[in-house]
């Protein structure tokens, strides 16, 4: 009985090892130094050289000015969008296609009615007849 358990445990370990080894990508299956040299994907000659350039004061000032212009243009654009006032509703009512759960007031449109679905969990004001 102990021999069969030992044999099954050894078989299980080998199966786990071979399963993990079979899922490795081909680049990671290196056998010797020659294959390591031939399969190396990192070549230092392939990368371009990096040069570091110091910025002078004039270029810094130009970039700051450009940044300030961009900021001011963004602020002006946002101010234009905000400037439109919304028309306030005259009475406390629910607009068409908005949520109108039972504690909410009635629908604003006289032709609309509150329709509920999914056991009154999703309610909205809808126009039922076009001839109203």
From Swiss-Prot:
GO terms for molecular function: neuropeptide hormone activity; type 3 melanocortin receptor binding; type 4 melanocortin receptor binding. One of its GO terms (cellular component) is extracellular space. Glycans are attached at residue 39. The keyword Disulfide bond applies. It holds the Pfam family Agouti. Disulfide bonds join 93-108, 100-114, 107-125, 111-132, 116-123. The keyword Signal applies. Residues 63-79 have a biased composition (Basic and acidic residues). GO terms for biological process: adult feeding behavior; epigenetic programming in the zygotic pronuclei; generation of precursor metabolites and energy; hormone-mediated signaling pathway; melanin biosynthetic process; melanosome organization; melanosome transport; positive regulation of melanin biosynthetic process. Residues 62-88 are annotated as: Disordered. Residues 93-132 form the Agouti domain. Its main location: secreted. The presence of a 'disulfide through disulfide knot' structurally defines this protein as a knottin. Involved in the regulation of melanogenesis. The binding of ASP to MC1R precludes alpha-MSH initiated signaling and thus blocks production of cAMP, leading to a down-regulation of eumelanogenesis (brown/black pigment) and thus increasing synthesis of pheomelanin (yellow/red pigment). This is Agouti-signaling protein. It comes from Papio anubis.
